[in-house]
C-alpha cells in the first residue's frame, strides 16, 4: 500500500500522536502498538506554548519533545469502565500511560496533576474536542477526546529567545518557570521583626506593659495627656536603643511609637471624647445645607458663565468625599486618620482617580478657581453629610499624636489638617453668630417644609404658597437631586408644572439638560425609572420644542453610573420610544454590554412585549439606515456573550429575516439560542428557529457536552425539536434522541413520520426493545449491509445511570447510528412505516415476524445442486461487485479523511491568526504593531453545518460499505474456493472409480451378494469393498457439494438483493442526501457571509 501524507496539524502534540504517515518506522512505534486497541484521552497544551517555548532542563523546544515517548506518556490518560461514571459528587481519577495520577473535576473544568509528577499543577480545561479518528493505526475508538489545557505539565518552560522582540510578553502562566517579584515594604518588614522579638522576649513585654499601666494611671480621665504619652514612648526608646536586639532597626522610634499607639489607642480615644463632650460639632442642624447655600459665588455668576454641569460635578465629588470621610470613625491610629483625611480632600478636589463613570466626564472644575474658601465650603458640606460625631477629637488627635510633629505643619498632610481645623472654626464661628443660627434655622425649617410637601407620603399635589419657597428652589439634596428631580420621583407633577411655568427664568432649558443626580441620572432618566410617564412626556415636549437635534441626541444618550441611557430603562413606554427613538444611539452599551435594543428584548414583564419589541427593532433599523449602514446583529452582544436571539422571548422571525445572522452562536456558557428556548420552554421561538435551514440542531455545549435535548423536560418541546431532527436525518423518516435512564433501564425518544392526523409522532421506547427489534431484523436479513451486530453490542453496554463527557459522546454516536440505520430500513421498506407508534406496536410486529420466520421451510431439506458454470457466473458477479465496492470504499476513506482535515485545518488557521494578532500587538515597533490590527481573515471555506452533515453521512456509508464488502469477501474468497476444492475432490473420486471399475455403470449396492467359489469369492469381496469405499466417498463429496452450492446459491441470491438495496441506498444517500445537501447548505450559508 502506498504511503500518503496528510497535512500537518498546528498543534505538535496532536500531530505527533494522530497524524503519523508511517507508524511502523516512527520513533513512537512502541507507543502506537501499546495504544492500538485502547481508548484514551489526550491532554493537549495550547499550540502557542508548544511552538514558542522550550524546556528549561533539557533546553529542547517543546515541539521537539512532542516526538519523545517519555514526554508524551504523561499527556495520555487511559480509560477504564469507571471513566464513564458521572463524577459530579466526586473527582474522577485517571492513570497516565507512564503510571502517573491525574484527577479531573469535570464540573469545574479543572485537572490536578498529582502522584508521579515532579511538579504538581492545577490545570484549567480550556476546551474539549472530539477528534474523529482518521488514521489507520488506532483501532480502539472511532472518536478520541482531546482536553486542551492552559499550559504544559511535568516540565518547566520559558519563552524562546525570538520572543524578545515583543514587549510585555506575559503569556507565561503562573506555574511557568519565572522569577517571582516579591518586593516587600521595608518598614512593614521591620515592624514584623520588631513584634516577633517582643513576643519571644517576655521580659521586654512586661516592661512595656508596665509603661502602658503607667499611662492609664497617670493620665486623667478627661485628658489624653499627650506629654505623658510622649514621655513613656521616649522612656521605652531610651531603654531599647542600646539593646543589641534592636540595633539593626533604622526606624526604632517610629516602631515603638506605633506599638504604644496600638495598645493605648482606646484609652486615649475615651479620654478625648470625654474631654470634648458637650463641645463637639453638631451637624444635625445643618443637615439641609445645600451647594447653592455655600457656593453662592457660583450661583451669582452671569447667565452665560453659570453652568449647572459644574454643580453636578461638585455634587459627585461631595458624595465620594462624604462616603470616604465616614471611614474616619473606623480608624485606630494617627496613620489611618491622616490617610483618610488626605484622600477625602483629594476626592473632593478631583486630584485623584475617580470611578470609571467620572473618568468619562469632562473635568468642568478645571475652569473654576478652587481656592481655599471654596474648598472649606465644600468640606463643610462633606462633614455635614458624613455625620461625623467626634470631629474635634479627630482634629486634636491628628495635631498631637504624630510621631513627627512637622508632618502636621507642612506638606499635603499639613494642608489637610489645617483645612479640617478651618472647618471646625467655621462651625464654631457660625454658632457664635446668633443671626447666622437664626437664619440657618429658618432656612432649615423652610427646606424641611418644602421637602415634606414634595414627599411621596404627602397626598397633596400642589403648593398654594409656592412663591414663599422661591429662595430655596435651587436646593439639591445629598443624592444630587434638584427640586425638579424630587418632584419627578415623587410624582408631584402639578408642582413640577407650576415650577417650570412660573419660574422659567430660574430653570432655563440649559439647566434642564444639565440637571443630573450624583449617579448621572438626568431628569428624563429619573422620570422613566420612577414610572412617571406624564413627567417624561412634559420633559420630552420641552426638549423637542426648544433643543436642536444635536442637543437632543446628546441629552437622550447621556449615561448614568451604569453607562445606561434613558433608552436602557424603556420597557413598555411605547409612546416615549416612538417620540425619542430616532435620537437614541442604538449601539451604545451599558456596563453589562447591553444595548437599548437588548434591554428592551430582555424586559419580559411588559404587557405588550411583542409590539414593543417589533417597534424598537423597526426604529433601530431605521436609525441604522439613517447613518448609512445596515443593521448589525453583532453590535448587540452583551458581556456574557448573549445575543439578541438568546434573550428574545417571542417573535424571533424579526431576527431570522436577517442575512448575516449566526443562529447557532454560543454565549460564554456555551448555550445556543435554541438551548435557551428549550430550557425556558419558549415554544413559539422553538417552532420558528427549527424551521430555519441554518440551525445546527445538535450543537454541543463545550463545558458539559449537553445538546438542546438535555435541556428539554417537556414532551411538547422534545416533539418539536425532534421533528427538526427527522427532517435533517438521512432520509427524513425517523430520529432517535434524548436517551434517559430509569432504574438502570435506558429509554430513548423516537420521532418519526406518522400516517395519523399529525405529520410526526414522538414516542418513548425502551432500548432493550430496540435491541430485540434489531435482532429480529438481523435474522430476517443476515446479509444486510447495515452493521446491526455493532449496534446490538453497543446497546448492551448502556448500563450507566449517569454519564461523563466520554459516555455522552458514545451515546450521541449510538443515537446517530440508530437514526441512520432505521432511516435506511424504512427507506428500503424492511419495516412498516407505522412501527414506532408505541412500544406495543414494535413488540407485536416482532412476534408476528418470528411466527412467519418459523413457518418458512428450511433450505437444507432440498439442497441445490450447483454446476461449475453457475458457480463461475456467481464468482464473476461477486468479483465485479467486490472490485467496485473496494474501489468505492477506498474513495470513501479518502473523502472522510479530507472532510476531517478541512475542519481541523480551519481551526488551525483560526488559532494561528489569533496567535499572530496577539503577538503582533506586542511588537516593540508601534508602526509594525498597528499593522496587525487590519488583518481580516475568513477561514470558513465551508460552513460548519454542511461539513458536519456530510462527514456523518460519509462515515455511515463507509461503515455500510465495509459491512457489505466483508460478506462478499467471505463468499468470494472462502465459500466459493471451498466449493471448487470439494468439486475437484469429487471429480478425482469419480476418475478413480472409473479407472478401477471401468465396466461398472454405477457403484453396486452393499446389499448385492451371490454364491461364489471360495478363492474367487475372496478376491471378489476385496474388489467389492474397494468399490463400496469409493462409492461412499463419492456420495459424501456429492452431499458436501450440494450443501456448499446451496449455501452459495442462497447467499448469492440474498447478496444480490442486498447489493441492489445497497446501490439504491448509496445513490440516494450520497447524491441526494449528502453531496446535493452539502452544496445547497454550504452555498446558502456562505452567501450570507459575502
From Swiss-Prot:
It comes from Saccharomyces cerevisiae (strain YJM789) (Baker's yeast). PROSITE patterns: VPS9. This is UPF0507 protein SCY_4172. Belongs to the UPF0507 family. GO terms for cellular component: early endosome; late endosome; plasma membrane; transport vesicle; tubular endosome. GO terms for molecular function: guanyl-nucleotide exchange factor activity; SNARE binding. Residues 289-436 form the VPS9 domain. InterPro entries: Ankyrin_rpt-contain_sf, UPF0507/Ank_repeat_27, VPS9, VPS9_dom_sf. One of its GO terms (biological process) is early endosome to late endosome transport.
